[in-house]
C-alpha cells in the first residue's frame, strides 16, 4: 500500500510518499510544492498551483490513500483562513483523484513519529530519517508530510489489529453459547 502525506501551506506545501509492506515502511519520494515565487495578493493563482502540484504528485507516484495535516488555530485569524484555503485546495486535488483522505493533527503526527506530541521540527526530521533509513535529513515540510504518511501507516495497522481482535466469531460468542441465536 502506498500512502501520500501532505503538509499543507500557502507558500510551501510538503509531500511525502511511503510504501507500506507489512510491518516495513519504505521511502518512495518527498518534496515541496512552492508558491513563494508568486505575487502575494494573487490567492486564486496560488491555490491553483497547489491543486495542480498535488494532482501531479498523485499522477506520478500513484498512492492508494492520502494523509493530510489538520489546520491548527493560529493567533492571527487571517493566517488561519489562508492556511485553511491552501489545505482545501490540497484535499480537493486528492479527492478529485479518487483518494481516501485521512486527517491528523500535528500533535498526533509528532507522537506517532517521535513519541512525543510536542517534538520540534528537528526531532521529527531526525525520526523520519531513521524510520525510513534515509541518507540525509529531509526538509522540514517534506519531513512533516512523510511523518503524516507514517502516522497513517501506523494507524492503519492499529485499526486492522483491533478489528481482528474484536471481530465476532460465529458460534464463539458468549450469547451463542448461552443459546441466544440471532
Swiss-Prot record:
Enzyme kind, highest EC tier: hydrolase
KW Cell inner membrane (keyword) present: no
Keyword tRNA processing attached: no
Main location: cytoplasm
Domain of life: Bacteria
PROSITE patterns for the chain: RUVC
Biological processes, Gene Ontology terms: DNA recombination; DNA repair
Active site: 7, 69, 141
Cofactor binding notes: Binds 2 Mg(2+) ion per subunit.
PANTHER family membership: CROSSOVER JUNCTION ENDODEOXYRIBONUCLEASE RUVC
The family this protein is said to belong to: Belongs to the RuvC family.
HAMAP family found in the cross-reference section: RuvC
Protein name: Crossover junction endodeoxyribonuclease RuvC
Organism: Polaromonas sp. (strain JS666 / ATCC BAA-500)
